[in-house]
């Protein structure tokens, strides 16, 4: 007989299934490339965050292998005990220089970085103001910080400013995604920076999906908009997306980084990333700076895809980033489209609530420098076939 624990949990799982929101993992049997082997079948994939195609780059792999031979497989300790190696330190210095900040600090994951920064900067008696479409890690960080937590309307400067003017919080932290992970649009960072300056608030940008891809050199959304450390004092970026590696960093002033080293619990109380991962990321960062053609190629593919989607009458969301969501509506329809694409050899994941708001389920299509124009053309052909099929057209949008 199932235990009380299992019975209780099974009821929640059954509800998820009934709502078409049940999630299952796919078993990959190949490296991250446009062609993935999943559960024994080969697909042309448009669902990876490997935006520059660096996860399987020979130089990145070689750097990790060589570092493993020198440093071993793991760091063995936290950064503050005995786990902070020369590889970690060099990567932090290189990230700081690349982003135009005084210092940078490595975190094991983006989720940990966001929780660590927000809980360090604000607490009881303070206020944290977040865009309604922020990543879950940012929202969780705000909720767990103990500060008064407010969500302003998506990219609505007036709504944010009104909230800032009403608060009596001692500290005010405004938090946004640089590129919103499920919508692909950019936050209006220049206007946000201006409002924060006017209202004596601090601006934090999570640039997980802009770092490496946007900006003249790939330094991200802050570079894209021409914003410096004074305008965006807290910058977070991840290393497992465009850089094809793993981990995250926070960049800012000397004082900010020293504060995080001393007060950010997710930094203090966890093992440092393996040194070979830091070495691989350093190789990726060099490629980001030396191979600008990758960003150019991605932008060309984005234009090709958006033009083709417009010709097909597909409802894409407003995005010039590699994240190109196709808005569908209902969970059932999104799943049906993803399944139909999979039957035709295209792997795209249906994104459903609670990740996105109810009624806005979508296919989160992502493009990479590793894709070819022919592969994007193939995607468009199959999308047109599926979206115009009788089976899909007959499904309700909500």
Curated annotation (Swiss-Prot):
Positions of substrate binding: 23, 135, 355
Keyword Transferase: yes
Positions contributing to pyridoxal 5'-phosphate binding: 110-111, 181, 209, 238
Protein task: Catalyzes the decarboxylative condensation of pimeloyl-[acyl-carrier protein] and L-alanine to produce 8-amino-7-oxononanoate (AON), [acyl-carrier protein], and carbon dioxide.
Any Pfam family the entry gives: Aminotran_1_2
NCBIfam families to which the protein is assigned, alphabetical: bioF
Protein family: Belongs to the class-II pyridoxal-phosphate-dependent aminotransferase family. BioF subfamily.
Listed PANTHER family: 8-AMINO-7-OXONONANOATE SYNTHASE, CLASS II AMINOTRANSFERASE/8-AMINO-7-OXONONANOATE SYNTHASE
Pathway(s) per entry: Cofactor biosynthesis; biotin biosynthesis
Record flagged with keyword Transferase: yes
Cofactor(s) the protein requires to work: pyridoxal 5'-phosphate
Subunit structure: Homodimer.
GO annotation, biological process: biotin biosynthetic process
N6-(pyridoxal phosphate)lysine PTM positions: 241
UniProt signal peptide: none
Catalytic activity, reaction form: 6-carboxyhexanoyl-[ACP] + L-alanine + H(+) = (8S)-8-amino-7-oxononanoate + holo-[ACP] + CO2
Name this protein carries in UniProt: 8-amino-7-oxononanoate synthase
Entries under CDD domains matching the protein: KBL_like
Molecular-function annotations in GO: 8-amino-7-oxononanoate synthase activity; pyridoxal phosphate binding
Entry EC no(s): 2.3.1.47
Recorded superkingdom: Bacteria
Keywords: Biotin biosynthesis, Pyridoxal phosphate, Transferase
